[in-house]
Amino acid sequence: MVHFTAEEKAAITGLWGKVNVEEAGGEALGRLLVVYPWTQRFFDSFGNLSSASAIMGNPKVKAHGKKVLTSFGEAIKNLDNLKGAFAKLSELHCDKLHVDPENFRLLGNVIVIILATHFGREFTPDVQAAWQKLVSGVATALAHKYH
């Protein structure tokens, strides 16, 4: 279980209120698919994923990225119970989709990069540390069903 300090919670929620979920979500999933191309196999139904520009412009990638980042909003509402907040998604990704749990960690790191590029100086080392802790906690919660 991940424990967040009051300062970490404030850093996470303070930044989250400024995140454009649609834009950042699409960019995060798109980057995951470009940087780690083997993850594309989970998205066969998304159509053209043949190049970075095709991926970044793909409406299905953008829509699913928004959905993924929206789930982080649920995590932020449940910082004290990430495992419970992601129980159903963990089951889906393990039992039905058979996603390698390492991909959750990769996506989390990409999300941190996206936030850093979007927020620049506002994304201080303390904010980054809090978000890194969050994405790690989410990755662990999503991988829970695998254990």
From Swiss-Prot:
<feature type="domain" description="Globin">
    <location>
        <begin position="3"/>
        <end position="147"/>
    </location>
</feature>
<dbReference type="InterPro" id="IPR009050">
    <property type="entry name" value="Globin-like_sf"/>
</dbReference>
<dbReference type="GO" id="GO:0072562">
    <property type="term" value="C:blood microparticle"/>
</dbReference>
<keyword id="KW-0349">Heme</keyword>
<dbReference type="GO" id="GO:0005833">
    <property type="term" value="C:hemoglobin complex"/>
</dbReference>
<dbReference type="InterPro" id="IPR000971">
    <property type="entry name" value="Globin"/>
</dbReference>
<dbReference type="GO" id="GO:0005344">
    <property type="term" value="F:oxygen carrier activity"/>
</dbReference>
<dbReference type="GO" id="GO:0042744">
    <property type="term" value="P:hydrogen peroxide catabolic process"/>
</dbReference>
<feature type="binding site" description="proximal binding residue">
    <location>
        <position position="93"/>
    </location>
    <ligand>
        <name>heme b</name>
    </ligand>
</feature>
<dbReference type="GO" id="GO:0031838">
    <property type="term" value="C:haptoglobin-hemoglobin complex"/>
</dbReference>
<comment type="subunit">
    <text>Heterotetramer of two epsilon chains and two alpha chains.</text>
</comment>
<dbReference type="GO" id="GO:0020037">
    <property type="term" value="F:heme binding"/>
</dbReference>
<dbReference type="Pfam" id="PF00042">
    <property type="entry name" value="Globin"/>
</dbReference>
<dbReference type="GO" id="GO:0004601">
    <property type="term" value="F:peroxidase activity"/>
</dbReference>
<dbReference type="GO" id="GO:0031721">
    <property type="term" value="F:hemoglobin alpha binding"/>
</dbReference>
<dbReference type="GO" id="GO:0019825">
    <property type="term" value="F:oxygen binding"/>
</dbReference>
<keyword id="KW-0479">Metal-binding</keyword>
<dbReference type="InterPro" id="IPR012292">
    <property type="entry name" value="Globin/Proto"/>
</dbReference>
<keyword id="KW-0408">Iron</keyword>
<dbReference type="GO" id="GO:0046872">
    <property type="term" value="F:metal ion binding"/>
</dbReference>
<comment type="similarity">
    <text>Belongs to the globin family.</text>
</comment>
<keyword id="KW-0813">Transport</keyword>
<feature type="binding site" description="distal binding residue">
    <location>
        <position position="64"/>
    </location>
    <ligand>
        <name>heme b</name>
    </ligand>
</feature>
<dbReference type="InterPro" id="IPR002337">
    <property type="entry name" value="Hemoglobin_b"/>
</dbReference>
<dbReference type="GO" id="GO:0031720">
    <property type="term" value="F:haptoglobin binding"/>
</dbReference>
<dbReference type="GO" id="GO:0043177">
    <property type="term" value="F:organic acid binding"/>
</dbReference>
<comment type="function">
    <text>Beta-type chain found in early embryos.</text>
</comment>
<keyword id="KW-0561">Oxygen transport</keyword>
<protein>
    <recommendedName>
        <fullName>Hemoglobin subunit epsilon-1</fullName>
    </recommendedName>
</protein>
<dbReference type="InterPro" id="IPR050056">
    <property type="entry name" value="Hemoglobin_oxygen_transport"/>
</dbReference>
